[in-house]
Amino acid sequence: MSKQEHRLVEEFLTGQMSRRELIRGLMAAGLSVSAIGGLLASTGVSTRAEAESLVEAQHATAKKGGTPRFTTLVPAADVDPVTLFNEGAIFTAQICLEYLCFPRKDYTLEPKLATSWHSSQPNTWTFNLRKGVKWHDGTHFTADDVVATFDRLTDPKVNSAALSAFKGILSKGHVRKNNSHQVTFHLDRSYVDFPYLVSAFTYNSFILPKNYKAGSFTKGRIGTGPFVLTKYTPKVGATYVANKHYWAKGLPHVAGIELKYYSDNTAQVLALQAGAADVLLDMPYQGSQAIFSSPDINVLSIPSSAYRGFHMRVDQKPFNDKRVRQAVAYCMDRGALVQGLWHGFALPGNDHAFAPIFPTSVLPIAHLPQRHQNYAMAKKLLAEAGFPNGFKATLTTENFLEIPQYAVFIQQQLKPAGINITLNVEDQNTYYGAGANQPWLQVPVGIVDWAPRGTASQLVGPAYLCKGIWNSAHWCNAAFNTHMAAYDKELNLGKRKHIALQAAKVMYDETPSIIAYWIKELRAERKNVHGLAISSFALLDPTGISLS
């Protein structure tokens, strides 16, 4: 029995999942009907005959056929898996491409093109690859494809959107083929959470054919996933058909998928309400309230590590004094923010990057006092920093989801302390820019939408380490870097929790960014939709979807 199979059976035996969920998990792991029957019989879950009957029933209850219609935002540019960065492009690729592993809703990892992985030491990781997998053109998936994929992503000349995620951790040429279905990653430094970097939490880590050419994805028939891209129309959408040779037996259930692009969330909501769409994949609360009362629609909610970083440039006055940054933090009414912007579909943050969903966040959450609005403290800190009458600043951000409303909230909350904020809201492409013109990395004060990450290291690395490529606060703290380096090396979970507390204390005290809330992600489905995997709703695994 593999580690994955053992874990699934153990979760069933301890009451953490139903028999139906157990069988679905084993099917997703690629086991055949007879293999599942034998496994469940050998572990005493049921007899072989009972188990095989249950598996067949599981398949039978999922109605075959139909074409579910998904909605997402228009991709910023033509979709290429190596360079994509926004939601619409990510979903377009995730329907037909696969990763080595994929996150579950509790942020544990499910094997996909890798069946297992292990580390002999924190800087060396070996992955065993799934056998019998074919590309959509009929050729066989092998270790050569995995080596080529990560050489491509880590090549500075390629301009991969994942280059920043792998910087300082994995370099080009450091993935070795051991045999046709096993590879070893030789890391630049110890990184205990490395499997998350090759999962869907690094969007661009799609496994592509060894001979992949930039710009060829939208021509179709590239991937190993449950659906095959057959048509892509810029600004309009994409069409997929079921992969008849998919490696997971009995899947997919539906005949295909239609992905439709919309200009904004309002248009997506209207399409779902009108019956022109079946699933709104990643839904903000603001602008979607009408859906919650619809009798034909289910709204799903899960906790996540997604947040909005309200950063302050620590290398520019007045934010070069941490007392000013702390004063700003004490102006924020986080409870009102969670209720007003999210109607409770968020959790209060406390200005450190250890999200409640991470296992190592227990001690930071327990031991760091939750900040609450305290104007007396804010004014005291401002006076000590030399700003008894407050100051003026311009907050620049993007016109995306609830962020403009959040900016107005900040403006209103800071005013009683004498901090007068002027708002500058730009479209997304302008705000993030390119090359030497990237306002979000240059403005003195800004808000950034941070998508969910699988671990604290993934979240912290690009944004808060001294050499972080997306360090919009321009914050560099030697103690924090030292703590995170120790965190990345430590295998013992208990010890990691204590290191996390030390790192969180530094960030909490320094306050380079205000993390006022952690988002509970939302997805809306018509009630005839079943089986769509629940992971982070910023990610998509459509394998098990069916329609009734």
Regions found by a protein language model. Give the residues of each.
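Structural transition elements
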Residues: F227, L347-E384, E402-Q405
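Surface-exposed binding/hinge segments that line
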Residues: H118, N128, A162-P209
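Periplasmic-binding protein-like
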Residues: P195, A290, D315, F319-P359, ...
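Gly/Pro-rich hinge or "lid" segments in bacterial periplasmic/extracellular proteins
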Residues: R104-T108, S180, Y191, S199-E258, ...
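Extracytoplasmic/peripheral linker and loop segments enriched in polar/acidic and small residues
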Residues: T126-N128, R371-H372, T422-Y431, Q458-K527, ...
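N-terminal secretory signal peptides
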Residues: M1-E21, A28-G30, T43-V45
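Ligand-site clamp/hinge motif
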Residues: H245-A290, Q411, N420-T422
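N-terminal lobe/hinge region of extracytoplasmic solute-binding protein
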Residues: T71-Q121, D151, G220-T224
